[in-house]
Amino acid sequence: MQRRLAYASLLLLTSQLVAPALLAQATGGATPAPAQTSTTATSPDGQATPQSQTPTGQDGQSADEPVEISAPGVDATAGNEIVVVGRNIPNTIRATPQIVSVLSAADIARTGEGDIAGALTRVTGLSVVGGGFVYVRGLGDRYSSSLLNGSPLPSPEPLRRSVPLDIFPTTIVGSALVQKTYSVNYPGEFGGGVINLTTKAIPAKNFISGGFTVAADDTTTSELGYTYAGGDADWLGFDDGTRGVPQFVRDVQAGKGSGLVPAAQVGQLSNASTTLLQRNNHLPANLSGELSAGSVFDIGSDRLGVISSLSLSNTFRTRSAIQQDSVSPDGTLRNDYRTLLTDNRIVANALVGLGYEFGDNTVRWTNVYIHDTLKQGRGSAAEVYNNASGLRFQQNTNWFERQLIESQLVGEFKLTDALKFDARGAFANSKRNAPYERQFDYLCSARTSNGLPISYDGANGAGGFQCNGAYQVTQRFTPFASIIFSELNENLWTGQADLSYKIDGERPITLSTGYFYQGTDRYSSRIQFNYQTSDGAGTAPGFPYNLYRPDYLLSPDVINNACPLRGQGACTLQLQFSTQAGAYAYDAKLNVHAGYVQAEAEVAAGLRAVAGLRYETAIETVTPVQSATTRLKNNYFLPAGTLTWNFAADMQLRASGAKTISRPQFRELAPQQFRDPDSDRLFFGNPNLRDSELWNLEARYEWFYARDQRFTLAGFYKRIKNPIEQVGFYTGADDRLQTGFTYLPSATLYGAEVELQKYVPLAGLGGDFFATRRLVAIANYTYTKSQINADASCVPNPAAAQGSPGLAGCASGFGPARLLFRDGASLTGQSDHLVNLQLGVEDTAALSQITLLFNYASNRVTNRGPSNLSGTGFQPDIIEVPGIRLDLVARQGFELAGGKFELKAEARNLTRTRYNERQDFGNGRFVYLNRYNQGRVFSLGISTTF
């Protein structure tokens, strides 16, 4: 069995929160543009000082060339209106009092990443977990907000509130920003940071570009994996009707019928194409392609731009995993599985944007389409499991289809020199369809179910477990087969208007106000059917049919005559609707209305202040089928303020304070079961959750000691009331580990981060090769410490069944925090140490780069440890060990036949870092919930622009 590919390139998205009329569209941030040009800045004596001339960068972007940014209140001219002492402070930093990081298109290109999440892993204090979800300073994805051109994005993931950023290719993103301090013109849900992606709108000139990349993973490509046929359009990520949902599933979904599906309807299901798991000893390479074009038209003094982009990627990842668990206080294994999973991921993207500039005004209409499909084959075997009776084999075939569509209209208007108005409205729809999640359970036995011996003539030529007999379905495992249909559909309407007015004077003041609306509607369902014979009680087909492989097991002959030894038609196969714990469907709504006022001014020489107040009211409801509605209605006043002291040339001190909130996600509130294909674990919501409230403090020192070079040092502190945490639990001794949700009385998080960026010219080494080249060194380190408070306060007990009595005098479904959690433990998802290093050589006169990228994240908690089945005490927390990651990226440009070409070579995860999620029971005893090797990934790509 082969191991998992490390091709899940980490992507860290950065987003910016800025007050109206404060942020210039200029470069800066985590990895500044590699070039420099002539500018003018204010010197300490108040005189305009010309900057030295340096070559234009290899990406064709100068240090002061505007970066395209669209977000609430962003002003393209603000950087020219603000007086800051120091010639080296980037315009982005001059223009905003907030702490921001900005990735321009050139910055993103240096990382070599294909999606925005991977590029942002290089930003100070950011890490990516679980396939594209951003953690800022160790706070989970629930504390990060994702915006597209300033408008919120819905998530196509039922287990998450935020959008996985690895579905955004870098080809459609003009810039990415992260703001770590809060400003009131953004939504009140803020914990670690806000991420804003700006799509490309008006090209600088007409162009056509395209590219193609091939990649190989040394644990997946041309190695063993599991696949299944599916439909003819699977390679594009779309179902061709093979997985069409029969009407009887819709009837059950609508609450019709008895829940028993007769044989005639069972036969309507797609069979062999969705059930037959096959070995593929030579999995193909990973392929991706992209095509984009843009045109710009001059209409008098106005400009009209059109831009479009299409891309498609098809990748494979195989994981050979150890999956264990224990329900014992001492860590004695209950289950010890060896699992092989192969993920075939197909991502299709499209963008069409129109932009119109007239005078100082801009209108843009942006349409984004992202379709992300995961086709998964899974086989799992064990001899150690609860009440073991021989070698057990489970097989799964899955299809998870996610889709995101957003259409957005933005207007940015400069009504007068002093008055500016921004308006933006958007509609977004996200879907997740997972039809035909199939599972079959077989037991190896030396005798048939009716007592006949089975002869065994030796190994079958395969490695791993050997069945000394034959696999058969029996009533030993109930159900012997199951099928699940799940759907999610979410609509999101948003609108925002921002008005700012600048009062001129010796010390100008900018006053701003705005209104925000968000309306979200979600419907989610999960319908599970278990196969059984018409005898009921989960019975399996009789001999010899129970020896059949899955597609034969569900053939018409077996469906209509499941007990052949008893005579024709004596029993048939039927489906039993399985009402798992919780609801099979729910509706959810979130309506938010908010308004804010804000003032920004230079209150003294070199001292700049911004202060504001946001009022936000929201009603969040989750209504499960046949269950009571959970309703959260809260109103908040959220103050925020930041001081910036430009006390010396090229040096600044910033201090910020704010109150913010975090609401429970729909999935966290809904008592519905879902399986996460990444962690291969079941999740279950909790209707007893409530909002979290955060108090945020931050101070930061910034020294821009040379052009595009800097040293920064920051400290931060957060106090969280009712932080929501993921908790592992077991519903019984035979049940698999599940993840639930609860909140704690409180938690604190504090830490510091340091960043250094340095360029060293190499011309002194002599020769033409080094004449225009320089060394690039970018390093950052973040230390974070958090502690949860687990006292006697009553908190939701995720392991408690609905309506069950509370623990130690607490209400039903609740228990004392000290009985469920370890006081002083770290928050889930938080690493104490994050290290990023980029070391490279680049040409300042042409496109030529080679960069070594190093990333390290220390251990972090993924789930609080489950409570012991006895009800007393709890197991150790579940810990992920991310370790180190080493990547190498090389880019070389050249011209051929009138076109510009770029050749890019990448080597990812050179250390072959293993994924490791475990519990430590002491004395060297570990339980590995998920452990597998991640392969090295080598890719070669070429792109061209005409």
List PLM regions with ranges.
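A beta-strand signature from Gram-negative outer-membrane beta-barrel systems
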Residues: 155, 167-211, 276
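Outer membrane beta-barrel strand-and-loop segments of large Gram-negative receptors
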Residues: 476, 488, 496, 542-544, ...
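N-terminal plug
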Residues: 66-76, 81-130, 135-138, 148, ...
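Gram-negative outer-membrane beta-barrel transporters
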Residues: 605, 715-719, 738-864
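N-terminal Sec signal peptide and the immediately downstream disordered periplasmic leader
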Residues: 2-111, 119-125
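Transmembrane beta-barrel wall of Gram-negative outer-membrane proteins
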Residues: 248-379, 399-409, 639-642
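C-terminal beta-signal and adjacent terminal beta-strands/loops
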Residues: 535, 845, 855-867, 892-946
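Membrane-embedded beta-barrel scaffold of Gram-negative outer-membrane proteins
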Residues: 420-426, 431-442, 511-512, 523-526, ...
